[in-house]
């Protein structure tokens, strides 16, 4: 979250027996076990999301955590830090796509607890192979090319695990940008259900 946007974050004021308490909207929603994953996935954002997941698990490991996703994707390593934490903690994680879940955003959407992965009707999801770029000596370029192929194979295995698709289908479907509507994402196995209303 960019510090210069803090003045644009709404504040919620609650009344209690001890007086008033002001929360920024995201902190208030965190009290309800709702985490927002919004914007490009990068290291700072991943660290905040991981910390929120760990905090909510420590508060009550038997209660669901709700992860709302609106992301164009981003860093594979940052996304995998969130993914691994989602798989590591005891709490079930309900994922809900609002807007878009592309690239690593789509991987995190499908990584929610089976039966608890949702999208709103007008979202778009997109899966593809990881992007990479490197310049330097030929031997170093080759090392990085081999690494990106390993990363691609790993991401494909994760999609296979959560969607139920066979690996050949995942490889073909992630070869280029592959956009899906909410209904198509349901048929593919990225999500379990499209939600029109609560």
From Swiss-Prot:
Belongs to the peptidase S14 family. HAMAP family: ClpP. Cleaves peptides in various proteins in a process that requires ATP hydrolysis. Has a chymotrypsin-like activity. Plays a major role in the degradation of misfolded proteins. This is ATP-dependent Clp protease proteolytic subunit. SUPFAM superfamilies: ClpP/crotonase (SSF52096). Keywords: Cytoplasm, Hydrolase, Protease, Serine protease. Gene3D superfamilies: 2-enoyl-CoA Hydratase, Chain A, domain 1 (3.90.226.10). It catalyses: Hydrolysis of proteins to small peptides in the presence of ATP and magnesium. alpha-casein is the usual test substrate. In the absence of ATP, only oligopeptides shorter than five residues are hydrolyzed (such as succinyl-Leu-Tyr-|-NHMec, and Leu-Tyr-Leu-|-Tyr-Trp, in which cleavage of the -Tyr-|-Leu- and -Tyr-|-Trp bonds also occurs). The keyword Cell wall biogenesis/degradation does not apply. Fourteen ClpP subunits assemble into 2 heptameric rings which stack back to back to give a disk-like structure with a central cavity, resembling the structure of eukaryotic proteasomes. Its main location: cytoplasm. One of its GO terms (cellular component) is cytoplasm. It is an enzyme of class 3 (hydrolase). The gene is clpP. It is found in: Cytoplasm. It comes from the Bacteria. The active site is at 103 (nucleophile), 128.
């Amino acid at each position: 979250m960019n510090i210069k946007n803090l003045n644009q974050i709404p504040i919620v004021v609650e009344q209690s027996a001890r007086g008033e308490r002001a929360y920024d909207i995201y902190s208030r929603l965190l009290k309800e076990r709702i985490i927002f994953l919004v914007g490009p996935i990068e290291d700072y954002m991943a660290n905040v999301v991981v910390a929120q997941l760990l905090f909510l698990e420590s508060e009550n490991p038997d209660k669901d955590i709700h992860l709302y996703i609106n992301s164009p994707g981003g860093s594979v390593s940052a996304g995998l830090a969130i993914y691994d934490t989602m798989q590591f903690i005891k709490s079930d994680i309900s994922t809900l796509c609002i807007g878009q879940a592309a690239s690593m955003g789509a991987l995190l959407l499908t990584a929610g607890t089976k039966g608890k992965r949702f999208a709103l009707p007008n979202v778009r999801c997109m899966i593809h192979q990881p992007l990479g770029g490197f310049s330097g000596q030929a031997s170093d370029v080759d090392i990085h090319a081999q690494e990106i192929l390993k990363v691609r194979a790993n991401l494909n295995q994760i999609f296979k695990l959560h969607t139920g698709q066979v690996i050949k289908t995942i490889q073909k479907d992630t070869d280029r940008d592959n956009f899906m509507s909410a209904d198509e994402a349901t048929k593919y196995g990225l999500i379990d259900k499209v939600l029109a209303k609560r």
